[in-house]
């Protein structure tokens, strides 16, 4: 809710070590708008404009949550993330919201997302450790799961 403050942080530290987390809700035209106040309010700021502003400071990582899908296990908004990667290929995008199956992980990887946040699907064992192995660089550590 304080972009100038975040920009000052990016100036004070190595911006490649910060992940900018942005929550969005699609408006009626399908435009991703930033949400605030625990997702209760839409800020009136378009995701793409916000990212552009922070990009100039050396930002390299963005976590984007589609709040309409978060915790719903309805599948991720691959169109949103593919558009994000298309618009800003220099960024490492992290997708959050809606992941329900290993197929969702494949779909997000295929659209260019660098990382995925999955909570409910893992907590409810919708994705097995065996299904996760291809996505983890240290998969041998899963042997104890």
Q: PLM features: residue spans?
A:
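C-terminal helical cap(s) of enzyme catalytic domains, especially alpha/beta-barrels
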Residues: 6-12, 106-145
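Glycine- and other small-residue-rich loops at beta-strand/loop junctions that grip anionic moieties
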Residues: 65, 70-73, 94-98, 120-121
């Amino acid at each position: 809710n304080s972009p100038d403050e975040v920009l000052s942080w990016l100036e004070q530290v190595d911006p490649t070590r910060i992940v900018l987390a942005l929550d969005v809700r699609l408006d009626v035209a399908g435009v991703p708008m930033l949400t605030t106040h625990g997702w209760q309010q839409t800020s009136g700021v378009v995701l793409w404009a916000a990212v552009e502003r922070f990009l100039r400071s050396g930002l390299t990582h963005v976590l984007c949550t589609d709040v309409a899908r978060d915790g719903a296990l309805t599948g991720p908004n691959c169109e949103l993330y593919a558009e994000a990667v298309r618009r800003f290929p220099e960024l490492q995008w992290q997708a959050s919201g809606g992941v329900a199956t290993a197929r969702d992980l494949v779909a997000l990887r295929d659209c260019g997302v660098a990382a995925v946040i999955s909570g409910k699907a893992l907590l409810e064992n919708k994705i097995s450790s065996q299904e996760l192995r291809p996505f983890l660089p240290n998969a041998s550590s899963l042997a104890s799961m």
